[in-house]
From Swiss-Prot:
Main location: nucleus
Keyword Nucleus attributed: yes
Entry GO MF terms: mRNA binding; snRNA binding
Classification via PANTHER family: U1 SMALL NUCLEAR RIBONUCLEOPROTEIN 70 KD, U11_U12 SMALL NUCLEAR RIBONUCLEOPROTEIN 35 KDA PROTEIN
Protein name: U11/U12 small nuclear ribonucleoprotein 35 kDa protein
A family per Pfam: RRM_1
Tissue specificity remark: Expressed in heart, liver, skeletal muscle and pancreas.
A GO CC term attached to the entry: nucleus
């Protein structure tokens, strides 16, 4: 955790495919392809890579003159190359701009990213092909950034920096504390339920006691008890006579 950086200092296809750079296994075939790829930067590319910017998400109608007009505000431009399709000659939507001075590169990197040119919000980053060790281009499953719709997001660059990894010990402690809190709440709930049941029983006992106090146990006098017994016996004898007479 102490050496965590949002921007990759060295390109690792496996880490680039992970939102926090901690994946241990590739999650798609493109990552596998990038891990197996061996890429050598184009030696035919000229210019100082440390003074060169990568400009992407350009309107396909944007021309070199427009780019020069915008980016010359930050300093003197030595070279500007708008990448075009070799067959059709149409723009591919990205360019490389080399400045004469480092301060111009830094200023353009800081201020030009997110500018709107010909109704398109552009993306500006340093050139990575010749400056980032281990670089693998997107066509081989690597690259950085990307759109969600493409399903091939790559992290560790300016467009999509790594997110800080979750501190697992902290998470475990939080879960432990949460579990203890839930157990305490359940215990309190049981205690409240038990107290409620106890109060109900006490209430019932009290009500029964009050009823008993209001209605004392009936005590039969001896003569009343004898009359009740004689009355019951007479009813039984009368029923027997009636049944014999049928």
């Amino acid at each position: 955790m102490n050496d965590w950086m949002p921007i990759a200092k060295e390109y690792d296809p496996l880490k680039a495919g992970s939102i926090d750079g901690t994946d241990e296994d590739p999650h798609d075939r493109a990552v596998w392809r990038a891990m197996l790829a061996r890429y050598v930067p184009n030696k035919g590319v000229i210019g100082d890579p440390l003074l060169t910017l990568f400009v992407a998400r350009l309107n396909l109608q944007t021309k070199e003159d427009k780019l020069k007009e915008v980016f010359s505000r930050y300093g003197d431009i030595r070279r500007l190359r708008l990448v075009r399709d070799l067959v059709t000659g149409f723009s591919k939507g990205y360019a490389f701009i080399e400045y004469k001075e480092e301060r111009a590169v830094i200023k353009a990197y800081r201020d030009a990213d997110g500018l709107v040119i010909d109704q398109h919000e552009i993306f500006v980053d340093y050139e990575l092909e010749r400056t980032l060790k281990g670089w693998i281009p997107r066509r081989l499953g690597g690259g950085l950034g990307g759109k969600k719709e493409s399903g091939q997001l790559r992290f560790g660059g300016r467009d999509r920096p790594f997110r800080k990894p979750i501190n697992l010990p902290v998470v475990k402690n939080d879960l432990y504390r949460e579990g203890k809190r839930e157990r305490r709440e359940r215990s309190r709930s049981r205690e409240r339920h038990w107290d409620s049941r106890t109060r109900d029983r006490d209430h019932d006992r009290g009500r029964e006691k009050r009823w008993q106090e209001r209605e004392p146990t009936r005590v039969w006098p001896d003569n009343d008890w004898e009359r009740e017994r004689d009355f019951r016996d007479d009813r039984i004898k009368g029923r027997e006579k009636k049944e014999r007479g049928k």
